[in-house]
Amino acid sequence: MTAPAASVGSTPALSLALPVRLDATNAETVSRELMARLRDSAGGQLAEVDATALQSFDSSALATLLALQRLATEKGSRLELRAAPVRLVELARLYGMQDLLLPQTESKAV
């Protein structure tokens, strides 16, 4: 599902990829897999979440991202969301979570 990314400075980044669909039907499984990858990674590094493939989602996607953000913070790591669909950014704003989840988000046109 995911592969390590190129190094950022001297600390390698962890690359996590969101699936095409992330909603209530698969959020628990996706979250468990991504959290395990993040949990097993070294602390203090950049963890990039690539949302390029994400096309269909609901608020469960935000819950998954929030859980990843919390774990990254606990590990002293930084989480960055890449290529977020415009609709995901809008959903985060609707829930008042844009500053927490999307501070440096690079969104893609949808």
Residue ranges and their predicted role:
Residues 1-57, 67-110:
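STAS-like cytosolic regulatory interaction modules
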